[in-house]
Amino acid sequence: MRHRIKGRRLNVTSSHRQSMLANMAVSLVIHEQIKTTLPKAKELRPYIEALITKAKKPDLAVRRSVLSKIKDKRAVEKIINILGVRYKDRPGGYTRIVKSGFRYGDLAPIAYIEFVDRDINAKGNVHQDANEEIKN
């Protein structure tokens, strides 16, 4: 029985999973959009949204808490100074997952995870990229 089991194993050890989520969170914060497999994107969403919710009320304790989850100071600065302010009035739902077909080698489902109301010029338009991949 799977009762009260949260999250996905992603077929890796717990330390690998924690490191992977932290690294993916840093990439998402810096680039505001990343391409990954669908299960990883679904695991990353609550992880990053919890960090942004904390960052809405910035103080030293919050900064240290976020820094304990992700070890990149640039990403922590951006979460607290930019993303926390950007989503101050939004009660959750800071990210969106856009499905983008399947990977060529192993047919793994691929998705883009991005911030809602992100800077479009920071990276390519996810909807155009998804449509181009579907056509190919």
From Swiss-Prot:
SUPFAM superfamilies: Prokaryotic ribosomal protein L17. Keywords: Ribonucleoprotein, Ribosomal protein. It holds the Pfam family Ribosomal_L17. The keyword Transmembrane helix does not apply. It comes from the Bacteria. InterPro entries: Ribosomal_bL17, Ribosomal_bL17_CS, Ribosomal_bL17_sf. Belongs to the bacterial ribosomal protein bL17 family. Part of the 50S ribosomal subunit. Contacts protein L32. This is Large ribosomal subunit protein bL17. It comes from Rickettsia prowazekii (strain Madrid E).
